[in-house]
From Swiss-Prot:
SUPFAM superfamilies named in the record: Class II aaRS and biotin synthetases (SSF55681), Putative anticodon-binding domain of alanyl-tRNA synthetase (AlaRS) (SSF101353), ThrRS/AlaRS common domain (SSF55186), Translation proteins (SSF50447)
Species annotation: Caldivirga maquilingensis (strain ATCC 700844 / DSM 13496 / JCM 10307 / IC-167)
Keywords: Aminoacyl-tRNA synthetase, ATP-binding, Cytoplasm, Ligase, Metal-binding, Nucleotide-binding, Protein biosynthesis, RNA-binding, tRNA-binding, Zinc
Gene: alaS
GO cellular component: cytoplasm
Protein name (record): Alanine--tRNA ligase
């Protein structure tokens, strides 16, 4: 952590207005105030809330929307451009799943100076999600997983200063005092250091009556490992908590009662819960706030707060538990709705894991309060409020309800398996057991604890259990970096970027280039190349290099930074040689059809299944390619048919396919973040591939692959197979062009073969199969009738061979028919105690429970075999055929039967 630069924080408003800088005796932080009698920093837990039931200021908003608009308008009037909110899923980043603050919108591309900001200065109100405090939600009175961070940002580039610390603090003070009507001496500025997303800087936490309402960060460090390096860009990064400001202005007992008041009232009616005593609620919120950050030591916290309030701790727990559950339902339902609306499908991996975590917590709390309504009713009730503030949720409302309903069904199924799962765990259940039960089966630890208690096993559930889970899954796992070659960046550091002829003309299959470097005898760097290097799910081109009358095969092509390296098999050219390049044109065209076909197929899937569909992975290859997409169930045959028809309509429409380089900001503003279907694209410019144009534009994506120039050149898109490969991910296997034709011809060949075997024409196969199935069913019914007669005959013979051993009836019988259903029915009608059936080298033992089948199997194994089983059934094999008399005699001699 860098040392706080005190001189930076001595702003002109503090000096000019006579603010006093003091050190808090409780937490040690310095703070600035106009209040001469203030003796602490003004933050929790150093001071209690002073606004509950007594809101500060003169401004009384009618709704939370009024506060948001007041903030944005305030900064618009002061030269800031209003910017629309970004999605809560950070598709433009590969280091985090979710947007946790407004600055996430501009990291890393703007903060690193790769691209300019969308406006400068700007103001925004960004929905954000943080699960670091998920276990505190509902308990502390102020924590949320989803919140809106209102902000104003300024990006100060070298030679182009916008504004810095003085103006930022003045804006904050003016907003809180003039716009909201707070007294000057009620606004405290606490010094601190902020760090996040690879950047850091000094900051002020803006506090009013015990609550932090905003953070003003002056970002000028880049964090690299343990080092803090000065950035060329100095960034004003502010965050004003919309919900917290609204809470303070209403003076409600908790942030939930302020923000979700309408929903909570409806939910209490729906669930049959009484409205709590606001005085007790207010007192509880004040005291729980002051116990923070130790608030998670719940047992001690409730006892301590109960003492302070003057009631019994058990009475307090009975009072707070239903309210805590309601607050969790309110917060989590909004957060999950935001996530699903922005394309998240609840699952057991990736960002979907985090959505499922919140839904499972809601279901757990529904269980705690004994709710008898489905979770979808909670969501439906809340969504009817949320769509007034977030109208975009209206379009996603049915999808949200469908996914929540599906998640509840999966949860109930998992819970039904709990007794069996717990029985497999020997001894005490550890935290790792609880984590594994949640990660593998989605069972909340509190439910595990209750089930374990029935078995006399005590389970301790950490109060921060869900925070532990979220921390394990909050970032994407880092894949292997670099290339597969024995070539490093140092090997090519002295070389210029390779000219990429494959982008200039994707139909250039031949060309000439100059050799710039030969590395280790087989890695060739040219000044330009028509060979496409592997990337974006598209394999590298193959072909040959010809020079000096010889030829070398190009077997692989990879990027090493901006340089393209060709791997050859054969003679090696010399530096300075001019080589003739020739790629396998048929293979390249096949891959181009597959890549353009992937874009068309993905867009067709989205149009049929819904806008929540995102690409989860792709591999373009020949003769088959795959496309993985996010979706919550396997598509129906009719949906697959519609997808294929839609894709081929685009092929037949002969739409143009064009690629162009665009500034990242311009592309995002024009097309939205949907351009990142294929993942994060680095750099200040992105290559946009557009299928169609004008009103006929079908698909737009950022893509670095090679594409056809018109859709008709694909010829045909044929979906071969559709599978669910994991929860929330569907895989489409497809083919295009001549490979699609080959696939159809192969199917026709199989159809002709079936027709020949059925002795019918190709168009009569379906009816012939129906007739065959009917005949087979009739034959099976006749077989069952005959089997029943055979069983009667076999039983008569078995009973004749029955012997008595230790008072029990035992029969050993050689059976020519080894059909499981037949044997089971035969055994069920056997009137004795032990039945041994032998077929060749195999045996089966059936008993009525008086004798253990496994004991009989152990005896039979002495004849040279192996087998095992349970109390009433066993099976095994003999190493060699055995005689019936040997089996009978062995049983008589060695089997000890006990009742």
């Amino acid at each position: 952590m860098p040392i706080l630069n005190e001189s930076l924080l001595r702003t002109r408003i503090f000096i000019g207005r006579g603010f006093r800088r003091s050190r808090c005796p409780y937490c040690g932080h310095h703070y600035w105030t106009l209040n001469p009698s203030q003796d602490n920093c003004g933050d929790q837990p150093c001071t209690p809330y002073g606004f509950i039931g007594n809101p500060p200021g003169t401004y009384r908003p009618e709704s939370i929307k009024d506060v948001r608009e007041r903030f944005l308008s305030f900064f618009e009037k002061r030269g800031h451009t209003r910017v629309a909110r970004y999605p809560v899923v950070a598709r433009w980043r590969n280091d985090v799943y979710l947007v946790g603050a407004s600055i996430y919108d501009f990291q890393p591309w703007v903060t690193e100076g790769v691209v300019p900001p969308p406006a400068n200065p700007l103001t925004i109100s960004q929905p954000s999600i943080r699960l670091t405090d998920v276990d505190k939600v509902g308990r502390s009175g102020r924590h949320l997983t989803g919140f809106e961070m209102m902000a104003h940002h300024a990006f100060n580039f070298p030679g182009k200063e916008i504004y810095w610390i003085n103006e930022t603090v003045e804006y904050a003070h003016e907003f809180f005092t003039r716009e909201l009507g707070f007294r000057d001496d009620e606004v405290t500025y606490k010094e601190n250091i902020w760090e996040g997303g690879g950047n850091a800087g000094e900051s002020f936490e803006v506090l009013v009556r015990g609550l932090e309402l905003a953070t003003l960060v002056f970002m000028h460090y880049r964090v690299i490992g343990d080092e803090y390096r000065e950035m060329p860009i100095r960034i004003v990064d502010t965050g004003y908590g919309l919900e917290r400001i609204y809470w303070v202005l209403t003076g409600k007992p908790t942030i939930y009662e302020a923000v979700f008041e309408g929903f909570l009232n409806k939910a209490r009616q729906l669930l049959g819960l009484p409205k709590p005593d606001e005085k007790v609620l207010a007192s509880l919120a004040i005291h729980m706030g002051q116990l923070d950050p130790e608030v998670l030591a719940l047992d001690k916290a409730y006892v301590e707060v109960a003492k302070r309030i003057g009631i019994d701790s058990s009475e307090l727990i009975n009072f707070i538990k239903p309210q805590e559950a309601l607050y969790v339902l309110a917060d989590h339902s909004r957060t999950v709705s935001w996530m699903i609306n922005d394309g998240v499908i609840p699952s057991n991996s990736g960002v979907g894991y985090l959505a499922r975590l919140l839904i499972r917590r809601m279901l757990k709390y529904m269980h705690v309060i004994g709710a008898q309504v489905p979770l979808t009713e909670i969501f439906n009730t809340h969504l009817n409020y949320l769509i007034n503030d977030y109208p975009e949720l209206k379009e996603s409302m049915q999808l949200i309800l469908d996914l929540v309903d599906l998640e509840e069904a999966k949860y109930k199924s998992a819970i039904s398996q709990l007794p069996k799962l717990i029985s497999r765990i020997k001894g005490e259940l550890t935290i790792n057991d609880l984590i594994n039960l949640y990660d593998s089966h989605g069972i909340p630890p509190e439910v595990v604890r209750d089930e374990a208690a029935k078995r006399g096993v005590k389970v301790n559930v950490p109060d921060n259990f869900y925070e532990m889970l979220a921390a394990r899954h909050q970032k994407p796992a880092k894949g292997e970096e670099g290339n597969r070659l024995d070539v490093t960046a140092d090997d090519v550091i002295d070389l210029p970027p390779t000219r990429e002829l494959f982008y200039e003309d994707t139909y250039a299959f031949e060309g000439k280039a100059k050799v710039l470097k030969v590395i280790k005898g087989k890695y060739i760097v040219l000044d330009s190349t028509i060979f496409y290097p592997e990337g974006g799910g598209q394999p590298a081109d193959r072909g040959v290099l010809r020079f000096n009358g010889v030829e070398a095969k190009v077997v692989d092509v990879q990027r090493v930074g901006p340089v393209i390296v060709h791997v050859i098999d054969g003679p090696t050219p010399g530096v300075g040689d001019v080589v003739e390049m020739r790629i396998d044109s048929e293979r390249r065209l096949g891959l181009m059809r597959m890549h353009t076909g992937t874009h068309i197929l993905l867009q067709s899937i989205r149009r049929v299944l819904g806008k929540h569909v995102w690409q989860a992975g792709a591999q373009k290859d020949i003769p088959l390619s795959r496309l993985d997409v996010t979706h919550y169930r396997l598509p129906t045959p009719d949906e697959v048919k519609r997808i294929e028809e839609l894709a081929n309509e685009v092929v037949l429409s002969d739409l143009p396919v064009k690629a162009e380089l665009m500034p990242r900001n311009e592309a995002e503003a024009k097309y939205g973040f949907i351009i990142y279907q294929g993942g994060v694209v680095p750099g200040g410019e992105v290559r946009i591939v557009k299928v169609g144009e004008g009103n006929d534009t079908y698909d737009v994506e950022a893509c670095g692959g090679t594409h056809l120039d018109r859709t008709s050149r694909i010829g045909l898109i044929k979906i071969v197979k559709v599978d669910k490969i994991q929860e929330g991910v569907i895989r489409f296997i497809f083919t295009t062009g001549k490979y699609a034709l080959d696939y159809v011809r192969n199917l026709e060949g199989k159809l002709d073969s079936a027709a020949s075997k059925l002795r019918v024409g190709r168009d009569e196969v379906d009816e012939a199969v129906d007739r065959l199935i009917k005949e087979l069913n009739n034959a099976e019914e006749r077989s069952r009738v005959l089997a029943r007669k055979a069983i009667e005959a076999d039983l008569a013979n078995i009973v004749k061979s029955m012997i008595t051993v230790s008072g029990f009836k035992v029969a050993v019988y050689y059976e020519d028919y080894w059909v499981r259903d037949y044997l089971q029915e035969l055994a069920s009608k056997y009137p004795g105690d032990v039945l041994v059936l032998i077929h060749g080298n195999e045996y089966q033992v059936y008993t009525n429970g008086k004798v253990k089948a496994i004991d009989v199997a152990k005896v039979l194994n002495e004849l040279g075999g192996k087998g095992g089983g349970s109390g009433t059934f066993a099976q095994g094999v003999f190493n060699n055929p055995v005689k019936q008399d040997d089996v009978v005699n062995t049983i008589k001699r060695k089997l000890t039967l006990t009742q």
